[in-house]
Amino acid sequence: MNTEATHDQNEALTTGARLRNAREQLGLSQQAVAERLCLKVSTVRDIEEDKAPADLASTFLRGYIRSYARLVHIPEEELLPGLEKQAPLRAAKVAPVQSFSLGKRRKKRDGWLMTFTWLVLFVVIGLSGAWWWQDHKAQQEEITTMADQSSAELNNNQSQSVPLDTSTTTDQAMATTPTSPVDTTATNTQTPAVTAPAPAVDPQQNAVVPPSQANVDTAATPAPAATTTPDGAAPLPTDQAGVTTPAVDPNALVMNFTADCWLEVTDATGKKLFSGMQRKDGNLNLTGQAPYKLKIGAPAAVQIQYQGKPVDLSRFIRTNQVARLTLNAEQSPAQ
């Protein structure tokens, strides 16, 4: 009777409870069992409480229970029927399904995150491209307007320079025409000077050829005026030299062009020293009251010297934009 009662009581106990009772009968602690089986104390505790660790497969759990049973001297055949009915096996079977659903949910969330990231990236690239295009278009429009203004000013300058050219040609014609009678009169005046020592010839010449003497006298009278015209024309180079002398000014602005370039130069008084298009291999010398304000359409096409020193335009060349700078007396360009 006692044997049957003990057998029924053992069947009523779970696997974990039977292992715990056997351990206590042998006087072993959970720490001692864990050290002998090379397990964690938490794993031994879960086995005794009939819990299936989430990170432990059912195959390993069965192996740990068998090792635990051999340690506490419980036959494995008595535990195998109970292992089939215990919750740890069912939990082990359900765990992979849960992990699969979690992985699927995580993958879906990562997909949404990646889509949002690509969307933000495309928006940033689109905004950057739109901003660059607007800036480039604005620069092109500004260069076009400046070129139109320069062409209009060139046309006005050409229309105004036509009468100036005609007046200069007429002045040159008037200046050159008196020179021929001056030379002839000079020769005529020299011939009487040679024949002057012959007193006997003078009455005959006066009596025979009075018209020639009249011509000589009339030609001799405008000779001072003719001789004064070259003297008056002689100061013209000095006037031209006076015009070019400002190039020696220490505040002179010297520009050499390696390509076609539009520019506008204004001095401190607001006077436009130059506004128009300069061609390749051209140079320009300007003088005025500092500081100078410059607006250059193609900074890479011009080399500027101010006060004998080159002006740095590299920052405008790198950005490929219209250069707006001010040259003061200390030669410190500022945009």
From Swiss-Prot:
Swiss-Prot/TrEMBL domain comment: The helix-turn-helix (HTH) motif in the cytoplasmic domain of the N-terminus is involved in the formation of spirals to maintain the rigid rod shape. As this protein is anchored in the cytoplasmic membrane, the HTH motif may contribute to protein-protein interactions to form the RodZ helix, which is localized beneath the cytoplasmic membrane. The C-terminal domain may be critical for determination of the rod shape by probably interacting with enzymes required for synthesis of the peptidoglycan layer, including PBPs in the periplasm.
Sequence segments annotated as region (Disordered): 148-244
Bias-annotated ranges (Low complexity): 165-205, 217-239
Statement: the UniProt record of this protein carries the keyword Cell membrane: yes
Membrane topology qualifier: Single-pass type II membrane protein
Principal place of residence: membrane
Pfam families per UniProt: HTH_25 (PF13413), RodZ_C (PF13464)
The HTH cro/C1-type domain, residue ranges: 19-71
HAMAP family: RodZ (MF_02017)
Coiled coil: none
Protein name: Cytoskeleton protein RodZ
Top-level taxonomy: Bacteria, Pseudomonadati, Pseudomonadota, Gammaproteobacteria, Enterobacterales
Topological domain ranges for the Periplasmic compartment: 133-335
Membrane spanning residue stretches: 112-132
Gene Ontology cellular component annotations, sorted alphabetically: plasma membrane
DNA-binding region: 30-49
Organism: Escherichia coli O6:H1 (strain CFT073 / ATCC 700928 / UPEC)
Disulfide bonds: none
Keyword DNA-binding part of the UniProt annotation: yes
GO molecular function, one term: DNA binding
Bias (Polar residues) ranges: 148-164
